Amino acid sequence: MEVTAHYIGGKPFVGDTGESFATLNPATGEVLAHIEQADERVLAHAIESAKLGFSVWSSMSAAERSRCLLKAAQLIRDHNDELAELEVRDTGKPIQEASVVDIATGADVIEYFAGLVNGLGGEQQSLGSNQFFYTRREPLGICAGIGAWNYPIQIAMWKAAPALAAGNAMIFKPSEETPLSALKLAELFTQAGVPDGVFNVVQGDYRVGQMLTAHPEIAKVSFTGESGTGKKVMADSAATLKPVTMELGGKSPLIIFDDADLDDAVSAAMVANFYTQGEVCTHGTRVYVQRAMYDAFVEQLKERTEKLIVGDPMNMETQIGSLISKSHLEKVLGAISSAKESGATLLTGGFQVTERGLEKGCFVAPTVFVDCRDEMPHVQNEIFGPVMSVLVFDDEDEVIARANNTQYGLAAGVFTQNLSKAHRVIHQLQAGICWINTWGNSPAEMPVGGYKLSGIGRENGQETLLHYTQTKSVFVELGAFDSPYA
């Protein structure tokens, strides 16, 4: 099988590094491609290419950059089905998700920043009759994006959109588990007229990430991944004082009060745990249900969860796809075993699905544990699989304290018909992304990111564009220079 490589300088690039790795379809075990591992020479070539691209791109007007990005967004939409299928084969997620969410929401973000950048400007202020100052918002230079494997192309677009809109170049490293869709995205940027070298893709494992974060010519790093790796990214970046944006792990609370709509609450809990087979950092895996609703909630949850369809991700009927890898499958099954040993009651699921031709994949039945306690390992630790923990609570103050008793602070949600209560509770929850009577919505206009060990900085929204710029202040004297020296 031919080795697939990088995308540098507006075209595919093979560095002849002598090292490669296979990327698999996790649902079938099929080898999709062999990917070249980048080395120092490949990265050096990407840096030089990005320098050239940056010199051209940053000299273009905001309107010119906006037109290129809008064309790219339309090309991405035109290739929605092709990109969705590629994403499904590389991640194992259901096509019914990828075909309507992953590609479209990424294109939304590109369009959003393409529109926003036209209003990006500085300020001017008079300091008297002969003096004034003005500021300029200037691009940083070459930015690095390091992606995760659960939403590969969406994450690539979320990172590229504000960086490119502000006039920067980007070197993007996808996860070695899901390296394919970023290459197609790079092609589409080139087709849209984005200058060569502005968006480059380098492939490889953690070693490539370390080279990027430590490189003195990388001006900023945006990373999505787990919290432990995020600490290493931040430490490496600190050596050259480069700013970082990090969207990290979570163990988010979903709080359901007894006045909530039961059907909606159960629906939200299922989406917040089983969407993308549980491999979503913002998932609400700690589901707190007020005692008066608990029994009815658990009864409906069990019935509806057992109707979910686990199957071939390319089948439009499938609702639960394959986990990303055999090693991750073992991790999730290990967490399920630990939950049983800790005394939680298995309500449903809890096993690997192997029938109907799924034996070569990494499928886990949607799993729900009840009779959970806050100190149980599966309640405290991020599992990143279709495993829900249901906990009972009695009053508002109690559940707020319990919900906040975690090292993470990525997301939180509240279901109640009392909007005063909803806002009161949300304002006390230590989380950066919050929902009231819904779960998971993340429009381009809304900044997203975490508190505590769940991250630094934000993606999407107006403030993100500013983080890809630096402020230059210019003081102007119109009169004679007033020197203190004779």
UniProtKB/Swiss-Prot annotation:
Active-site residues from the entry: K159, E247, C281, E459
Keywords, in A-Z order: Metal-binding, NAD, NADP, Oxidation, Oxidoreductase, Potassium
Record: residues binding K(+) 1: T23, D90
Sites of Cysteine sulfenic acid (-SOH) modification: C281
InterPro entries in the cross-refs: Ald_DH/histidinol_DH (IPR016161), Ald_DH_C (IPR016163), Ald_DH_CS_GLU (IPR029510), Ald_DH_N (IPR016162), Aldehyde_DH_dom (IPR015590), BADH (IPR011264)
Molecular function, one GO term: betaine-aldehyde dehydrogenase (NAD+) activity
Assembly information from the UniProt record: Dimer of dimers.
Designated name of the protein: Betaine aldehyde dehydrogenase
Annotated organism of origin: Vibrio vulnificus (strain YJ016)
